[in-house]
Amino acid sequence: MAFEGYTQETLDFLWGIRFNNERSWFLAHKQDYEAHLLAPTRALGEQVYEALHAAFPKEPFLLKLSRIYRDARRLHGNGPYKDHLWFCVRAGGEDWTGRPTFYFEIGPDYYSYGMGFWAPKAALMEAYRKAVDEHPEVLEKLVKRFNKQAQFTLSGPEYARKKTAPSPLLAAWYNKKSINLQHDAAPDERMFSQELAQDIIEGFRTLMPLYTYFDGLCAAEMV
């Protein structure tokens, strides 16, 4: 199944599950979930994965599609269902949240995609800063290229006590506890078209040099 775009029914379901987060409502609308949210998200994920695999065949990428069911052990007062769905294209391994990962997520009032790693170990970020200190020119070249595009922005929590970066260009990158390069948007016409897949694929290709840089740090830290 090729990705043809999301539909208004996609958003209707997502808003519905946000405000009716209970089993009876979900079961009554399960066909809507499968047809208008799960199927197009799977198709989008497969198209993005196949394009990245073709462009970078040596990368050990795999596709992971989330479940709409929350972990019953971690509801914390929330309903049993998520009001969003995501997929990621990442390297294998269990501890993937500490490695760079390409992702897409859709909710009732937004969609987002990009690349980041959200739970890196302190030792990894220390190794990252050491690598920047020793060879700042490597990341500077990547950051200069990143700053020429407008599709993604740098985000992520920062250290309360600022760390001294080797150059002003790297200050924002050097002080992050974790790094996310993201594109956020409210529902728009792009989301309802086939062009969304190409936007994501081209964006991920743009981010690939940064992915390679951070993944190399992760690989070195695991040795």
Describe the function of each predicted region.
Residues 2-16, 23, 45, 152-223:
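Long, solvent-exposed, polar/charged low-complexity segments
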Residues 15-68:
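Active-site acidic/histidine clusters and adjacent loop/turn architecture
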Residues 30-37, 117, 128-132, 192-196:
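Short histidine-centered catalytic/ligand-binding loop motif
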Residues 48-59, 146-147, 213-223:
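Surface-exposed helix-capping loop/turn segments at secondary-structure junctions
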Residues 54-81, 85, 150-163:
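A short, surface-exposed loop/turn module that caps and links secondary-structure elements
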Residues 63, 82, 110, 176-178:
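Sequence-level motif detector for i,i+2 pairs with an aromatic at +2
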Residues 73-133:
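Aromatic- and glycine-enriched beta-alpha-beta binding-site module
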Residues 107-168:
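Compact, glycine/acidic-enriched structural inserts
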